[in-house]
Design a protein with these regions (language model features):
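Conserved beta-hairpin
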Residues: 51-67
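Conserved acyl-donor/pantetheine-binding loop and adjacent beta-alpha core of acyl/acetyltransferases
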Residues: 66-95, 101
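Conserved acetyl-CoA-binding loop-helix of GNAT-fold acetyltransferases
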Residues: 96, 102-115, 138-142
Length: 151
């Protein structure tokens, strides 16, 4: 598997993967990604800012994660408390190809993205997910993330 920055050539595949995820959420009555985002324009902008990263297996993109430097307005106030107020990166739009789920790819994405962040000298990561997205909550806990509260 290869971890790399996404390119414009990946865009159709990334849109297809996010559309699959939207349908999966909808089928499970999870109101995540049901209001239009992520969409092609959001992903294209993330590619142009070198924030969208992918995991590739035998030439096929099978996972994606967006890495954004903080601060972010949505993280300014939470019902709970962050571990600290030091600089951080935020992970967004984590997605794994539906047919590849259950193979540890989310953990691999987190691990690779964490290494990317550490190379910048930043030691904090923030991430949020929908309260009904139990699969992502389990993946985050399994990867050592600590729930600090709700947005």
């Amino acid at each position: 598997m290869t971890y790399r920055l996404a390119t414009a050539e990946d865009l159709d595949r990334l849109v297809a993967m996010s559309d699959q995820a939207k349908e999966s959420f909808k089928a499970k009555n999870i109101d995540q990604w049901q209001k239009g985002e992520p969409n092609r324009q959001v992903m294209e902008a993330s590619i142009l800012r070198s924030q969208l990263h992918v995991l590739e297996d035998t030439g096929q993109v099978v996972g994606m994660i967006t890495i954004v430097p903080g601060p972010e307005a949505s993280y300014a106030s939470i019902d709970g408390a962050w571990l600290n107020q030091e600089p951080y990166f935020a992970f967004h739009r984590v997605c794994v190809e539906e047919s590849m789920k259950g193979r540890g790819l989310a953990a691999r994405l987190f691990s690779e993205a964490e290494q990317y962040v550490l190379k910048t000298g930043v030691r904090n990561i923030r991430i949020d997910t929908h309260p009904d997205n139990q699969a992502m909550q389990r993946a985050l806990a399994k990867s050592g993330y600590i729930c600090c509260g709700t947005l």
